[in-house]
């Protein structure tokens, strides 16, 4: 089960609004997976601006919504940019990013689903969408390393880290109940949760 499926389950159980990213909207994504260097900047800027727009729409329309579950956090864009862009592109990207991030709300909690890149690679191979078929294991390993490095230093909001390889939220309802109980507890700092 991926982040989108888990977000959907959590939103349903917690009666929360669900906010999903939509990578299929990005007209550069398939080109990026075919020619990373050539299409990285366009792909990344499109994602940055579309995620920013989604965050702004969310702020305008849901001022009184108490619970919101999203399958991404805005800062993820910067993690991908650090892997995908060359030095000059990253410099320009970071200038744009720094202007936008000021207006993006911070989440109350980030749930980081860690997964072994090999396991993730196998799961992506089973998906039918074209863009997932083009993703290489080396790329997943680089992203995994970038995420781990980012979250090792992250302290802006509470962070709960789970190894998603230890859970099967769809097939085993007790795993979802376990997570829901965990989410009811006050969240502070960085916490790792390991199933026993």
Q: What residues fall within each predicted segment?
A:
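Conserved nucleotide-binding/hydrolysis micro-motifs of P-loop NTPases
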Residues: 23-26, 74-76, 115-120, 166-169
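Glycine-rich phosphate-binding loop used to anchor ATP phosphates in small-molecule kinases
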Residues: 39, 43-105
């Amino acid at each position: 089960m991926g982040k989108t499926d888990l977000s959907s389950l959590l939103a349903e159980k917690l009666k929360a609004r669900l906010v999903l990213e939509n990578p299929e909207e990005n007209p550069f994504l398939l080109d990026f997976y075919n020619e990373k260097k050539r299409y990285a900047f366009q792909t990344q800027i499109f994602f940055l601006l579309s995620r920013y727009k989604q965050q702004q729409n969310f702020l305008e329309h849901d001022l009184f919504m108490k619970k919101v579950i999203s399958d991404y956090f805005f800062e993820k864009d910067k993690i991908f940019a650090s892997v995908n862009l060359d030095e000059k592109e990253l410099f320009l990207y970071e200038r744009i990013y720094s202007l936008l991030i000021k207006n993006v709300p911070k989440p109350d909690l980030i749930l980081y689903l860690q997964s072994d890149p090999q396991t993730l690679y196998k799961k992506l191979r089973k998906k039918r969408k074209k863009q997932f078929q083009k993703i290489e294991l080396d790329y997943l390993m680089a992203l995994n390393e970038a995420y781990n490095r980012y979250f090792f230093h992250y302290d802006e909001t509470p962070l709960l880290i789970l190894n998603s390889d230890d859970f099967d939220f769809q097939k085993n309802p007790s795993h979802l109940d376990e997570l829901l109980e965990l989410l009811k507890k006050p969240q502070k700092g960085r916490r790792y949760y390991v199933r026993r």
